[in-house]
Amino acid sequence: MARLRLEDFGPELLSPCNLGADTGETVTLTGPSGSGKTLLLRALADLDPHRGVAWLNDRPATDFAAPDWRRRVCYLPAESHWWSDRVRDHFPHVDDATLSALGLPGEIPDWAVSRLSSGERQRLAVARLLSVQPEVLLLDEPTANLDPANTERVERVVADYRDRNAATVLWVSHDADQRERLGHRHWLIRDGRVEETA
């Protein structure tokens, strides 16, 4: 049985879908701009209204308190949000090994957020998500603005986390090469429908 299973599931603007993603899998999600990729991720994280049921390990989302579901099924938006100007304030705990693997300096937790480049913010957002230890990672173009070296770092860190924690990853990407590198399977949003493709 799939770790994450969607049963007649979808946000208002998409047709209901019946799809699943297994433990240890990365599913890549693509579709034209404005097709509903972000809407689907936000609905899966129970941040936006939707119909149908999302299941995690054979338990419906309704079995979980909303904060518990959102910790287990964790959404990383394309634009990260920072509510305090000190990096450390955004982490339940700082994992130096993850920061290093992402190519970030060890002293970065003590930096002001306002000092960070856009690429540093993007990689820190990945580290912050992993520090929550989710079971399902919903990643909305997490490498969109990164150079090839840092893109490779993020891909490797996420894959290592997935493999170590038997996690499931849903990764939005417009990069066909990246989808081929990462995806065990592929979902496509087209004409308001989410479907699995070869």
Regions found by a protein language model. Give the residues of each.
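Q-loop/switch helix immediately C-terminal to the Walker
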Residues: 72, 79-98
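Conserved ABC ATPase signature
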Residues: 112-116, 120
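Hydrophobic anchor residue at the start of the ABC signature
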Residues: 126
